[in-house]
């Protein structure tokens, strides 16, 4: 009788003493044929280090003997239990076992939710949910089985969305098939990597290079990442990010980021060197450099900003590609990609960012960011909402820049509640629920929440035909009947845009309650930035990009309302570009081209000599600042309009030269409106630390601001100059018109001709319904 091999003996006896050479590490990973040279041809062509493998080939197919159990099998799991722990006496493939159990847990979890739950089963499920850990929670307990952790994560992903079960099932089956095929392929495959190594090494070729991301030579890209991997450099860039980027783009948790990049602790529950964490760190460094000025880069790193940006961009793209962006199910990878888009948009004027924002929208929808799952921690909820509304904000900004409809509809942008008005220090990954949902006063999320409100109002005012389902939260006479009647009420009700603007003002001023602009640079920026947003919303309500009806209403002779609405927008933008307290946030601010184009057209057709004389220095300075931002002289319709305006001013019958002073703009003397109170000009807070914003409680705004602590729409009236007050701002236009002498009889036609001849996709690039990413520092 043939003697059977023992269980501990899984390899056939060697016939020779020579250890064969198998495929190298890289060829094995790529699953390509290796010529087994030293180095092999594939590694030499790619410029990587060839690591040959010398070992005995493993048996395959029917020649492979299965290990036998010595101990008794484990007891059968109890009903309703979705995880089993098998402890064989001989080593087995842990990754294969983990994937099988995770697949079983996924299917059993789906079956348990398809039947009626008993009270005992519900209590057991709640006990599992309380121990649920996610990507953004603390590190797992080392005594806990990795199989149990993975099954809970799979169960949580399945519960997040009804249709997510099939996506999870396909992913698990695909991963299981890869493990089985890799163990049986070609004979050159070695031991299957463990689950930890599998998580830390996702496929690095998911087609990301077709989008223009990543480097053609990964080894060269990794070498270029070395300066950013310097702990000292990473710590400095993280501090810059927390001071200049995080207050505006609020998608990360400040304490967690600080503990990771500054103090050297692990990031949430990720393992060291995880590709998602590497991608996030590279994106933080890239966005921090993009927010710095040339002087900051020279002082801090003794290098040119352009060189640092190029290096950081390649490193960020390579890290995002290694993290598997196109196939990711990890919210951290999406956070890194959003930060990458924010940074790239500040330096790249091509439509590439507009195209890539669509990818962020798709990934965000695929992860269900716009949904409110029942089973998620407070930490996950806040991070998810912040990321979704930031993507909505960027989607609207991109639609303005490329004359396109937003990808996210109004109902999707309002499908989930806004993040809480709290500080990041108020919660952490272990917070089960937040007892105090909102704070009064300035918080880490104040300015971000204002922009979240503004992006939704911007969709309603400028792209009202894009969505017909949501009536903007303001009841209209016919909004309760159907989507068609809602759209008709928007079109026919002339007061609907003003209602939306009034609603936004109330929400924005509520967030500014107890905000003292003299406490820090962030408080100053939030105060004036919110005023600029309110002024821009007023302008959009009076003159949106897309009219609700068939054609815009005719311009009345002598009506200067639009010009008066444009001036506060331009004034605040110039203030941000000239005041030293806005230096850290200037990368985010740009000259609002829409208000500038409208002001130019209004100045050209207006015959109000006093108003044009007052407005022209501000308009001309804004135009020059816009040209400086673009780095070139404006041509096309916008430049033609400016030339025609200068020709009109140079004409003998135009305004007297003495009445048009030359533009003399300096940071020390920003333009002011008569009667507009302004905060004190002391710069004691310009060097305020940016990592921990002071939150004054129980204080009231200074008396010199002229703004009560919290008032609705009438609050803005205190900020408006008496000479610019207009009773038709939120009501019916005045019945009387001030017909000035010498009014051009064709002013109405000329105004429409000039303004309609300025396509904003030609003159503006991505710009602002509100603040947007600038094209330069």
Curated annotation (Swiss-Prot):
- Keyword DNA repair assigned to the entry: answer is no
Q: Where is the composition biased (Low complexity)?
A: 475-489
User: What domain of life?
Assistant: Eukaryota
Tell me the disulfide pairings in this chain.
none
Pfam families in the record: Fungal_trans (PF04082), Zn_clus (PF00172)
Tell where it localizes: Nucleus
Q: Which GO terms describe its cellular component?
A: nucleus
Question: Which InterPro entries does the protein's record reference?
Answer: Sec_Metabolite_Reg, Transcription_factor_dom_fun, Zn2-C6_fun-type_DNA-bd_sf, Zn2Cys6_DnaBD
Q: Which GO terms describe its biological process?
A: DNA-templated transcription; positive regulation of metabolic process
* Segments of this protein annotated with the region Disordered: 1-20, 61-85, 111-144, 182-213, 419-440, 468-496, 655-699
Work out whether the entry's keyword set contains Secreted: no
Keywords assigned by UniProt? Answer: DNA-binding, Metal-binding, Nucleus, Transcription, Transcription regulation, Zinc
One of the entry's Gene Ontology molecular-function terms is: DNA-binding transcription factor activity, RNA polymerase II-specific
The record ties this protein, via PROSITE patterns, to: ZN2_CY6_FUNGAL_1 (PS00463), ZN2_CY6_FUNGAL_2 (PS50048)
Composition skew (Pro residues), residue ranges: 668-677
Matching SMART domains, A to Z? Fungal_trans, GAL4
Residues in the DNA-binding region are 24-50
PANTHER family in alphabetical order? UNCHARACTERIZED TRANSCRIPTIONAL REGULATORY PROTEIN, ZN(II)2CYS6 TRANSCRIPTION FACTOR (EUROFUNG)
User: What function does this protein fulfil?
Assistant: Transcription factor that specifically regulates the expression of the ada gene cluster involved in the biosynthesis of the linear tetracyclic TAN-1612 neuropeptide Y receptor antagonist.
Its recorded name reads C6 finger domain transcription factor adaR
Which species does this protein come from? Aspergillus niger (strain ATCC MYA-4892 / CBS 513.88 / FGSC A1513)
Q: Which gene encodes it?
A: adaR
